Amino acid sequence: MKILERSLKTCPIVQRGEYTYFIHPISDGVPLIKPDLIREITTEIIKIGDLNVDKIITAEAMGIPLATAISLCTDIPYAIIRKREYKLDGEIAVHQETGYSKGELYLNGVNKGDKVIIVDDVLSTGGTIIALIEALRKAGAEIKDIICVIERGDGKKIVKEKTGHTVKTLMKIDVIDGKVVIL
C-alpha cells in the first residue's frame, strides 16, 4: 500500500470549524485520482475481501470509483446507496449521521437473500456504514464483508458496538499538527 501511504502523507489539510479535513483523491476526488492508486486499492480489496457475493454495495459519492473498479475486475455488479430519493418499488430509506452531515440515504437494487460486500472510501464516525447496514438488513440482504480504504477516528469500534459487524480497513490515519500520520 505504498502509493496510498505516500498520497496520504502529502495530501492537503484544511480546517472547517472544529473539524480538520484531509483532502485526498480517494475521499474527495481531488486533486486527481490516479489509476495506480485505484489499482493498488482495488487489488488489496480483492485480496482481503469476501467476494463470494451477489453484489457490491457502496455509498454515494466517493465509494463509486472503488465499486466500479472492483466490479470491473470481478464481474460482480454493484448498487449505490444514494442521497436522493427515486421512489422506485422496494426503495429503502435510512437516516445517516456523520461527523459533518445528516440526511436520508436511499437503497435500490438489493433483494432479500442477496449476499453483499460493502466498500467505501473513509470510515470515521461510522455513520455511513451504520446506515448502509440498516438499509441492507431491511432489504433482507446478507452482509458478508465490509471494507473501507481509510480509517480515521473511532468508527470501527462504533460500527462493531452498534451493529455487531467488523469493518476491515486498508490504512489507519490521524491528522496531527497539520499532517496526516499513518498509525
UniProtKB/Swiss-Prot annotation:
GO MF: guanine phosphoribosyltransferase activity; hypoxanthine phosphoribosyltransferase activity
EC number: 2.4.2.8
InterPro entries in UniProt: HGPRTase-like, PRibTrfase_dom, PRTase-like, Pur/Pyrimidine_PRTase
Similarity remark: Belongs to the purine/pyrimidine phosphoribosyltransferase family. Archaeal HPRT subfamily.
Pfam families noted in UniProt: Pribosyltran
Broad EC category: transferase
Record's keyword terms, sorted: Cytoplasm, Glycosyltransferase, Purine salvage, Transferase
Localization in the cell: Cytoplasm
Gene Ontology cellular component list: cytoplasm
Subunit structure: Homodimer.
Gene name per UniProt: hpt
Role noted for this protein: Catalyzes a salvage reaction resulting in the formation of IMP that is energically less costly than de novo synthesis.
Protein name: Hypoxanthine/guanine phosphoribosyltransferase
Catalytic activity from the UniProt record: IMP + diphosphate = hypoxanthine + 5-phospho-alpha-D-ribose 1-diphosphate; GMP + diphosphate = guanine + 5-phospho-alpha-D-ribose 1-diphosphate
Pathway annotation: Purine metabolism; IMP biosynthesis via salvage pathway; IMP from hypoxanthine: step 1/1
GO terms of biological process kind: IMP salvage; purine ribonucleoside salvage
